[in-house]
């Protein structure tokens, strides 16, 4: 039995372990943190539980599962949970609301049923939208989405990788409302300004999410029906260990030793002892900013493309969460709220309404009735209370600033949705560290951003080092986005590369095409793609024609 050591136990590492253990490999995983799951994990608000109750649930950031996810959804269906699977813990949202400083909440449907009433809501949302968009704005955005939809893969990968989203949609020539909404959403989606994010990533995702919101069927996004580790990660870890995976928590990888073009061992510290781990194959499942530090001269000599990973170390931004525990349940909307005017690019979800089987009276001091989980995607723009960016604020100031920005966005036109006296307590992601009061805070887990031109720096899941494989969201994938889906797909690609290297007869992991924009499983755009591919090969620009 061949042995595989996986360095890093987040979604990528656990996905790789899952696919390997069911194919008969011996698998060991070494995870630095005390809680499994990486960025996806939920975590306790330590010390909040009293009189035998559990600590309140906190998280790095709320989890969501867009309709277009394929790889991670398939994995959820293969993790046992009680009498079913973890997949059964997904629950649909029905709304996506936009909050501004100047108008009441604008509801967008997240799930559209076949009815005239709902169809009219979509029309009204798009054309009588209260966001200041003109018909010219809407037509321009539609034209640009159509361009992405009808462009060939080669053009998207080679040409649009070199164009930022702002320039691609010609935002300079459009209204301030257009710029704020259609250019600004990249900050919320990928924690990256539209003048930096490449169109190869943003374009297909923007099209896919627009189609998912505006076409009937499953909700465009689903959530778990409880804290992530309770409903997914912990059952997954139990399953992996039951299958034979040797999963180590609080095990710090110190170095990876490459000699004569192959990996000889990895050095790990656990329980105060440092030791070498050896295997037939190694999967590095670290995020890019960590992996960059482990790449040695010997590794680069064996595979010069690994220099690209080192270049990507700075292609990260911050997207971290804060949870507000409330004295009463405050649904706000049955889904997510995007705070369009909030300088810190906030999104939130009121979680208790999606957690029917979670009794919050068994948490904290027993009086919490609701959890408002907020993601902060802009840490560099000054806020409304202190005139400072989030990076320069204390934890207490971040709490106050985010709360104030939400109140400004929700309490509009006489409506009072969010009041100070409903706040019980709060929890800021522990990845945000305040080591020196006189300096900016630091972030232990930033998020990869796909800057213009960075596709060329991203590696495949296999390397020129025959026993080293990569599984993380910076790896080249069809998903092409720093997400759980991208991490899971990268893990599958790493496992498939091991199977190939091993000459294994085991069935490879399934890899899905993404962003195919099919309707009823029919690729209606295929003729356009063929036409554009012929033009691209001749060096001609996209023209959107069929022939």
Place the predicted regions along the sequence by residue.
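Glycine-rich active-site loop/strand segments that organize a redox cofactor
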Residues: 37-71, 145-153, 201-203, 207-213
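Conserved Rossmann-like nucleotide-cofactor binding loop
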Residues: 12, 35, 289
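C-terminal segments that line or cap access tunnels to active or ligand-binding sites in enzymes
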Residues: 214-224, 279-281, 286-458, 464-489, ...
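N-terminal Rossmann-like FAD-binding beta1-loop-alpha1 element of flavoenzymes
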Residues: 2-29
